């Protein structure tokens, strides 16, 4: 009988442990001695302070050897596509303006609409091709300079812009090359200055203090 009772108790305890009711747990007295870090209690299952698990910045899973920031090659697709779309939009607006100006003495009719539409299409394609070509040259020079120097900084931006202007205006002789290079140098220098304006202002403020 006693053996049967003991067997029954073991069976009951095994079932209770299986459903999580009979296992040993942590009481309030056991958890009362666990120190707090801020407002988060330390887990009894971890030997690591949760403060070290908090990341101040977003972290992404990257392939081995990959950079956290996009390089020139990745940005080239966005740059070329954005310039083409911007050129098409600007050219379409300019074509609409020119079309309305050239046909202002004509009555609203099908020939006038066709002429305006042709002007919009022609100007849109022209500006999209122009800005897209400039973006392609700029991106290609940027990738080549980055791979050659092994670094990505504002010097690459200025050099790529200068070389783009020089190559784009190379058909105009030495004067055209100089003018294109100066234009590219000026635009990219202003862009680099705009990107680093906050950093420069903070550095000047620290020096003044």
Curated annotation (Swiss-Prot):
What subcellular compartments does it reside in? Mitochondrion inner membrane
| Membrane-spanning parts | 73-93, 125-145, 181-197
**What InterPro entries does UniProt report for this protein, alphabetically?**
Tim23, Tim23-like
Task: Tell me which GO cellular component terms the UniProt record holds.
Answer: mitochondrial inner membrane; mitochondrial intermembrane space; mitochondrion; TIM23 mitochondrial import inner membrane translocase complex
Major localization class:
mitochondrion
One MF term from GO for this chain? protein transmembrane transporter activity
Some GO term, biological process aspect, for this entry: which one? Answer: protein import into mitochondrial matrix
Oligomeric form and interacting partners = Component of the TIM23 complex at least composed of TIMM23, TIMM17 (TIMM17A or TIMM17B) and TIMM50; within this complex, directly interacts with TIMM50. The complex interacts with the TIMM44 component of the PAM complex and with DNAJC15. Upon mitochondrial depolarization, interacts with PINK1; the interaction is required for PINK1 accumulation at the outer mitochondrial membrane, kinase activation by autophosphorylation and PRKN recruitement to mitochondria.
Note the NCBIfam families from the entry: 3a0801s02tim23
Spell out the protein name for this chain: Mitochondrial import inner membrane translocase subunit Tim23
């Amino acid at each position: 009988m006693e053996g049967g009772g003991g067997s029954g108790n073991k069976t009951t305890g095994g079932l209770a442990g299986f459903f999580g009711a009979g296992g040993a747990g942590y009481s309030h007295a056991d958890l009362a001695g666990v120190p707090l870090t801020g407002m988060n209690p330390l887990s009894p299952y971890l030997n690591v302070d949760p403060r070290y698990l908090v990341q101040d910045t977003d972290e992404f899973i990257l392939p081995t050897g990959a950079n956290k920031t996009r390089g020139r090659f990745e940005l080239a697709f966005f740059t070329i596509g954005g310039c083409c779309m911007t050129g098409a939009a600007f050219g379409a607006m300019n074509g609409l303006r020119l079309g309305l100006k050239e046909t202002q003495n004509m009555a609203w009719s099908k020939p006038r609409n066709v002429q305006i539409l042709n002007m919009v299409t022609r100007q849109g394609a022209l500006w999209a091709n122009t800005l897209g070509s400039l973006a392609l040259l700029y991106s290609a020079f940027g990738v080549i300079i980055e791979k050659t120097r092994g670094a990505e900084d504002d010097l690459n931006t200025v050099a790529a812009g200068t070389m783009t202007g020089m190559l784009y205006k190379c058909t105009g002789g030495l004067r055209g090359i100089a003018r294109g290079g100066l234009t590219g140098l000026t635009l990219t220098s202003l862009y680099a200055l705009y990107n680093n304006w906050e950093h420069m202002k903070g550095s000047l403020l620290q020096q003044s203090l």
